[in-house]
Every structure is written in C-alpha cells, then in structure tokens.
C-alpha cells in the first residue's frame, strides 16, 4: 500500500522528470556538406556513439576508404577495405551483424562482392564474390533473423546465415514511387535500396530519377512495411529529398541513407552536385530529419536555411610516405611501372604547384581528370 507521503514523493519525481524532459535541449538541425568534392554514393553505419562511412571509389585502388566520426560532421580516415581489383567499385553498403562488419559492393563487371572485418579499422578480408546480380546492394536482417540483400529495381535475394553467399534466387518485391510525369528527370531508375528498422516498421529508402541528368533528376524516396520483404507502402511525403529547381544550390540530390544518433536524433545522408559544378563531382551532404505522428520521416527544414560546408578542409600539401597504409587519405595511389597520385578537388578555383624529381629516362606530368572521356594535362 502507498501512503500519502510516498504518493507525494512519486508525484514529485514524475513532475521533475516531466519538466526535465520538456527542458532538454534539442539538437541543432544539420544542413551541411560534410564531404565536399567527389564523394558519391555514401553509405553510413552507427555503432554506439561511433559512425562509419564509405563511398564509391570507382577505378581507384586501394578502394573503399572507411571514415570514422563521433559527431557526423568531422571525419577521419581509418582503413581501406579493398586492396586491389580489375573493376570499378560503386554504391557500397556498410553494415554490422552479430559483431562483424560487412561492406557489400557491386562492380563494373555486373558482380557483387562482400568484405568483412572484426573492426572497421581492419584488417578487412579478401573480397568474396556473391552469386547476386544487380547494383547498389542494401543489406537487411529480417524479423526471423534471416539475411537478405536488396538490389536495384526492387529485387531482393536471400543470403546464407554468414552473409557470404546467396541462398536463393532474386525476387521482385517493390515497384518504387511513381513521381509526376512532368518532372524533368533522367529516367525512372529505381536504385540505391537502404533499409533499417524503427519501432514496428522496416523502412526502405531508395533513389529514383537518375543521378547525372538534369538538375531536377535525382531524389530520395521512402517506403515502409511490417516485414523486411514487403509489401511496401510508399510515404505520402515522397520524395524526402529532391531538387525542385535549377536555381537551387544543390543539383540532383539523391542516393540517401537515414541514420540516427545515440540521443535519438535522425538524419539523412545523400549526395548532390554543386549548382553548375558537375566537374567537382557529387558531394556528401547531411540534413536533419524529424518524424510525423504517423511515423514518416520528413526534413526538418526543406527550404531557406543557409548551407554550411565543413568536413575535409585544410592544407593539401603532400609528401609521399610509402610506410603509410592509408597513403594519406585525401590522395589515392596506383602502381604500374610508375606511381599515380590523385586527389579530389573541393573548390571552385585553385592553384596547383607540383615539383618533380624524375630519373633519367623517366616521365612525369600533371592532369585534371574527371573520367576516361573528360581530362586534360601535360606529361614529359
């Protein structure tokens, strides 16, 4: 039995708890470019108070540079997950299952691979080839503990318990969200499935509209289901992220992943081009997300807020250190009969001073390179 004094104590404690909760400061909404330059197809994972991210690395090796952060804004490199390969790597997915870290990734050969590690700092395993087609893999653990890999066009493939092989054939379970026909896009192109569970719902976050078309092409679309395999219900607030006009600061916003922090704040991480600066590639951006009363994510601020640029800034001077396993993270290196050193431009304009010491009979040069069809420079 509760006497009068105990009841007053309980009620006072509840009142203090209610006031404390009401006065707890909310996190400042984020609307920030955290990786300026060409850091496309971001995938992000939270493990306690730590965040890990990697991006498409294409033809540059060592590949899949893994980054670490504790505040989602400032990032440090900690490992490269793939040492070498004869293919291009793009649109990976990083996840953690039963204490082990996984990165699933597709290649230009139409194949999907996975690498694993006990710690995100590595060492990472040799790539394991999966009998899974498609691109843009997205891993999910279902309510019964079974593992699945989603790929583009709404397909899902069951995996073995260790996540290292397909356990069945792909099945189409999602048709995407039909955006208005009058929108100017590159095509429908349902891709980039990223999945997570919140409460009783599984959420499927995808990209549509094409990533390199007109400024208004790309978008982030959300669907949900009580099952990891659907059926999927599209959000009435779609698209979560989209460029509506060529006048906006960022073009072709898309390829998003939703992530929370330990305090319960939610964010969407995605990529986009700077207005009229396709040459800088697709930067990685983060924005704050809030939840509606009926459990749909929406942006905290859709328009009007000033964009901030944090992340990878500072001195880009470089002295080659062959003993550094990361090869200084702002640079990539390749080895043939010589050495290729590359870095990503993050500014609208810049100056480059290069000093070479070349042995007799050798050659050196400096190039601006976007892809195999767009580059110029000089060597001698």
What is each stretch, according to the model?
Residues 2-11:
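Bacterial N-terminal signal peptides that target proteins for export
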Residues 69, 117-118, 159, 225-226:
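Conserved Ser/Thr-centered positions that define the repeating blades of beta-propeller domains
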Residues 63-66, 112-116, 155, 219-221, ...:
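A short loop-to-beta-strand structural motif that recurs across blades of beta-propeller domains
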Residues 188-244, 251, 374:
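Loop/turn-rich, solvent-exposed surfaces of beta-rich toroidal or solenoidal domains
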Residues 25-46, 59, 72-96, 122-141, ...:
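Surface loop/turn signatures of beta-propeller and other carbohydrate-active proteins
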Residues 21-22:
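C-terminal motif of bacterial Sec signal peptides marking the signal peptidase cleavage site
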Residues 34-35, 40-60, 79-82, 90-108, ...:
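Hydrophobic core segments of beta-strands in well-ordered, beta-rich domains
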Residues 295-380:
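Extracellular glycan-recognition regions
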